[in-house]
Each structure stands twice: as structure tokens, then as C-alpha cells.
Regions:
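Phosphodiester-processing cores and adjacent nucleic acid-binding clamps
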Residues: 1-221
């Protein structure tokens, strides 16, 4: 099922789409317009400590953030951020540092901290030391509950960090329609990563809750 089929299945009037590049925006925009859906489009970016430091050691301090466009001008700003990450910060994949992001920031954007792969996760569950700098914006934070062993612990860490400072939103990542689709999804991910089902080496892929069915169960859609 396409993401818009899942939105129809859940009877929602808006869709929040987060992608790792801007290549899918135009198709997403046209599809949402055709279905009279409000589109909230976000670019998930890899944050590094220094955009000029392209070493193996620099990758240990990387984490993810999501930048959402509020409007048409925000879309143009997303293009600038993506271009900088692709051409100036590229090291195995697009990257950008907080200083560069700050220079490109505008009031047409919203910064979100994802639940998985964020600096909160990295600092508490890996050996990484990630130091974000939010002087130029007021980020929002996402939490999830997908029945993973660390979900509750990580949610508590997010609560500790955001206490009296930042808004927190409970979210649900959806990658497929039903729980029985999990194996097919995992197979697809393994093919993309050139791994096997016996040893997938994929973080946060030990749960079948990342689906529309689980969302429907939790929120009664």
C-alpha cells in the first residue's frame, strides 16, 4: 500500500510524511492535493559535529533531526538545507552541522527531534556524545511506543530533557499496513541494506508495531 492508501484506510484528513531526501516531495504534494489532504512534509537529516570533518571518527557523533516546512517558503528553505547537506557535508550520505543549519534557518521551518536515532537516544544508549545547539529555534520532540524494550526508558529520557522547556508529541511511525506485513517489510529493508533475515543488522526492527493496524488499535481510528 502507498502512504496515501494508508491515510485513507485510517480515515485521516492529513498526512505527515518524513523522508531522507527532497526527491519525493513533488509526487507527495500532487497526491495530497488530489485527495484533498493536508500535507506536512519533513526532511530527516543527519547532523554531524562539523561539516568539514569527514573522518570515520566524526560519524560516531552523528544523529538525526527532522525539519518540517510550514509553507511554500519553507519548502524553498528545505531545498537549501538539503543542497548543503548533499554537496558540502556529504560523507557516505548527506550531512549538515548545527552551525550550517542555523545559517539557513527561518521562521518558515519547524525543527523536530525524532524518537529513534536522536541525540537523546545516542547519548543514553550508545557510546556517542552528541551536543545539539538550539539557540536559533524551539524544537519539538517526538515519542513512540512500539513495544520495543527500550521505548519506555527512552521516553523517560526525553521527558527528563524536555521538562518545562519543549513540547513533546506522541507519534507513530507507519511503514506498512498490517502486522502480518512485517516480514515482507523486513525483507525489503534487508535487500536495501544488503543483509540477511538471519542477521539483518537493522536498528529498531524487532517489532511489528510500525504499521497502520497498530495505529488503529492505539487510537481507535
Amino acid at each position: 500500500s502507498s502512504v496515501f492508501d494508508l491515510v485513507k484506510y485510517l480515515k485521516l484528513d492529513s498526512v505527515t510524511l518524513v523522508e531522507d531526501s527532497m526527491s519525493g516531495f513533488l509526487e507527495a504534494y500532487k497526491s495530497s492535493e488530489k485527495r484533498n489532504l493536508q500535507l506536512q512534509y519533513g526532511l530527516r537529516i543527519t547532523i554531524c559535529s562539523n561539516i568539514e570533518n569527514k573522518t570515520t571518527e566524526s560519524r560516531a557523533k552523528e544523529y538525526k533531526l527532522i525539519v518540517f516546512a510550514k509553507n511554500t517558503k519553507g519548502y524553498s528553505d528545505l531545498i537549501k538545507i538539503s543542497t548543503t547537506a548533499c554537496f558540502e557535508g556529504f560523507y557516505y550520505y548527506p550531512r549538515i552541522d548545527m552551525l550550517s543549519l542555523k545559517k539557513l534557518w527561518s521562521d518558515n521551518l519547524v525543527l523536530a527531534v525524532p524518537f529513534y536515532d536522536s541525540f537523546v537516544y545516542k547519548n543514553n544508549f550508545t557510546y556517542s556524545i552528541c551536543v545539539p545547539e538550539f539557540s536559533f529555534c524551539d524544537p519539538i520532540f517526538f515519542t513512540e511506543d512500539n513495544n520495543l524494550p527500550m521505548d519506555r526508558l527512552l521516553a523517560n529520557k526525553v521527558a527528563d530533557y524536555t521538562k518545562d522547556k519543549h513540547e513533546v508529541y506522541k507519534t507513530q511511525s507507519i511503514y506498512y499496513e498490517s502486522k502480518e506485513d512485517f516480514l515482507s517489510y523486513l525483507t525489503f529493508r534487508c535487500i536495501s541494506k544488503r543483509t540477511t533475515l538471519n542477521k539483518p543488522n537493522l536498528e529498531h526492527c524487532s517489532s511489528n508495531e510500525f504499521c497502520a493496524e497498530a495505529f488503529k488499535e492505539k487510537y481507535g481510528q
